[in-house]
């Protein structure tokens, strides 16, 4: 049995020439205390942001609109097999700061064992930065901001998760 990533529509999810001034926080099934830590962190730095919560639902067109104008995003997500909201952000060339998971038991409300997992299954250094523990938030955030212009997440998506490379792996 082989598993294959579903391709990202990089034609649909591509950057435009919008000025990149927005910040977003994407939350999906992580503990509310972790969410509050990130919100407090952003507030303490006087950073305005848009929040998208998977469980509380959001309108995709609002998310896409922010992605087109986002200078970076922060992901607070449980485990993902692929994570299309993350894939869309990266296809829009938005660098991400990810509070990654180690175990499926980190999903808030889930009843999983300590099965190894990740929030970002398809990732490399061009996509942004990630960390595992709350005490790493500030230093990892500072790294992301100090090197923000160097990230190329869209290039990673074009090379690995656009239609063509996914199709080639099927053959």
Residues covered by each model-derived region:
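Active-site-proximal region of nucleotide-activated glycan assembly enzymes
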Residues: 1-2
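Alpha-helical elements of Rossmann-like donor-binding domains used by nucleotide-donor carbohydrate transfer enzymes
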Residues: 37, 62, 69, 136-143, ...
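Acidic donor-binding loop of glycosyltransferase active sites
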Residues: 68-81
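Catalytic binding pocket for nucleotide-activated donors in carbohydrate/polymer assembly enzymes
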Residues: 81-160
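Short acidic alpha-helix that forms the nucleotide-activated donor recognition element
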Residues: 59-70, 91
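Conserved catalytic-core segment of nucleotide-activated headgroup transferases in glycan assembly
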Residues: 6-63
């Amino acid at each position: 049995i082989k598993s294959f990533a579903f391709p990202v529509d990089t034609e649909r999810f591509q950057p435009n020439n919008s000025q990149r001034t927005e910040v977003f926080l994407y939350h999906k099934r992580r503990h509310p205390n972790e969410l509050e830590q990130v919100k407090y962190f952003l507030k303490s730095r006087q950073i305005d942001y848009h929040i998208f919560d998977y469980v509380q639902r959001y309108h995709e067109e609002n998310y896409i609109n922010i992605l087109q104008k986002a200078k970076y995003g922060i992901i607070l997500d449980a485990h993902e097999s692929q994570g299309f909201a993350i894939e869309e952000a990266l296809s829009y060339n938005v660098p991400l700061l990810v509070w990654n998971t180690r175990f499926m038991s980190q999903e808030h409300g889930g009843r999983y064992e300590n099965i190894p997992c990740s929030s970002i299954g398809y990732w490399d250094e061009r996509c942004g930065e990630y960390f595992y523990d709350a005490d790493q938030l500030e230093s990892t955030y500072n790294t992301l901001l100090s090197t923000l212009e160097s990230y190329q997440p869209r290039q990673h998506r074009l090379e690995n998760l656009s239609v063509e490379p996914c199709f080639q792996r099927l053959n």
